[in-house]
Amino acid sequence: MSLQDESFPTDELFDQLNNLSSSGARNTWFAEHHKPAVFERDTAPFLEICYADPDFDADGDVANKSAKTCVSDPVGRDQEDEDDYDEDVDGDDHKLGCEKAPLGSGRSSKAVSYQDIHSAYTKRRFQHVTSKVGQYIAEIQAQDQKRRNVKFAGFQRVNSMPESLTPTLQQVYVHDGDFKVDKNCQTHSNSDSNYNSNSNNSSSSFDRLLAENESLQQKINSLRVEAKRLQGFNEYVQERLDRKTDDFVKMKCNFETLRTELSECQQKLRRQQDNSQHHFMYHIRSATSAKATQTDFLVDTIPASGNVLVTPHPLGDLTYNSSKGSIELALLSVAPSARVAQNPVQVQRAIHPQSLDFSSVSTEADGSGSGEHRVETSSRALVRRTPAPNNSETSQPSSNDSAIEVEAHEEERPSSRRQWEQQGELISPRQWGQHEGMYYFDKRNNRVIEVMGFNISQGRNQSHDTIHNQSINDSQTRLLVHSMSMSHLEAHDHFRSKRTTLGSRMLRFLGPCVRCRNGDPLNRSNVTYKDGLPAMPEEEFVDQRNQR
């Protein structure tokens, strides 16, 4: 145990022990050291000394009373201080050997306690120091005194309890939000003054609670009104949102309808442009057409009253050996070969190089191969293109339309007439208008073929016709060169004016085939051939290529 511990009994014990050790004499009563009288606690506690005086104030300065409670004094004090302390005390009290009195009898006027462990010198020395322990003890005593003054039979009010649970008020909380005081509140008869003070406090608290309750009730009512207003505004906004959504859906449907109509109109316009005669050979057809072959239709009989110079197609169909539609390209405004009027019984045809001067001379043929003789008295050039009988201006073109009727009558230019007269050949426009023929382009072999009849009985006059046709062939060759040159000049004139004609387009497309004069059968991709397709008037034409 430390010597500086406050729980150590007292300093007098050490003094007595020191005196005994110095004198060498022992007292018999000190033999019972196991139970010294100094440790016996008096029945009166130390704290009751403060309340011995009836006029004592609980809130007084208890901290300054260092005689009762003070900080511990160090045990190893100076010997001089002890000597001074011995001089102040009577000499009889210090003579332990002569007296039989028990230890501690010299302080009979003062209560002995474990807390009173300091000497008088220590108390006087630290008298000016405020004791924090004493101050804390004084506060505890004051609170205890207040609790003892309040004399109620039931539970005492504690600061931690809310006012609504205080037994003194006996308040009951009703469902409507109001408080009412129980009338059965009972108090002791000997505490009327305290009851009056408490009732005043409770009444003021009750009024305050009523005021707070009223203010809260007003807030609740205002919040309810605000909630109703917000609910109405929410319904209004939701209604507007629904209307906007409906309008958006209707607008979207209208937009889809307009877009569909626009796409349909664009498709109709595209088909109309593709079907127009001005775009027949210039644009690529996007729409599909019905498939047909040359065996789809029966052969029409040739009328006896027809023109003997007209050679119909063998099968009456312009498609030639095609299972995927038309692969032939009709040549528009192709000048026919010059023919000499002979005996109707003896008519022989030959295929010669044709002129592609589309601006000067053209032929006309219908879809069935039978042509009609038309004469135009007008001096200006007339080019008319009429669709096949199975077509209309607004219908889709069929794949059977390999040839288109073209009628062109124009007077011969004076310059070309003079040139032909100088070369010794003269072909009148009437002669061109009276002769008609059917031509189609064989895309497989890259050749231009004129369909004509061939009579075996005319073989006797073959030599005469061969000589005559040779002269006509030479004249047509010169005519072809002239037509190409004239078309080339006209194409330059149209190029300056940024205008293109059908003749210039066909010349650019078929120019290499016409200008080629190579008769080598090995190079068939760049050569234009002239063949004759024999056909008996009374028999059905059978193509040998279909027999494969």
From Swiss-Prot:
Q: Which GO terms describe its cellular component?
A: nucleus
Residue ranges annotated as compositionally biased, kind Low complexity, are 189-205
Regions of compositional bias (Basic and acidic residues) in chain numbering: 406-420
* Region described as Disordered: spans on this chain: 67-109, 184-206, 358-428
Keyword check for Cell cycle, yes or no: yes
- UniProt-annotated location(s): Nucleus
Q: Which UniProt keywords apply?
A: Cell cycle, Cell division, Developmental protein, Mitosis, Nucleus, Phosphoprotein
Q: Where is the composition biased (Polar residues)?
A: 388-402
Residues bearing Phosphoserine? 362, 368, 463, 471, 475, 483, 485, 487
Q: Name one GO biological process term.
A: bicoid mRNA localization
According to its UniProt record, where is this protein mainly located? nucleus
- Which Cys residues form disulphide pairs? none
Name the residue ranges with Acidic residues bias: 79-91
Tell me yes or no: is Endoplasmic reticulum among this UniProt entry's keywords.
no
Q: Name one GO molecular function term.
A: mRNA binding
Subunit arrangement?
A: May be a homo- or heterodimer.
Primary role: Has a role in localizing bicoid mRNA at the anterior margin of the oocyte during oogenesis, and a poorly characterized role in nuclear divisions in early embryogenesis.
Protein name (Swiss-Prot/TrEMBL)? Protein swallow
- Organism of origin is Drosophila melanogaster
Originating gene:
swa
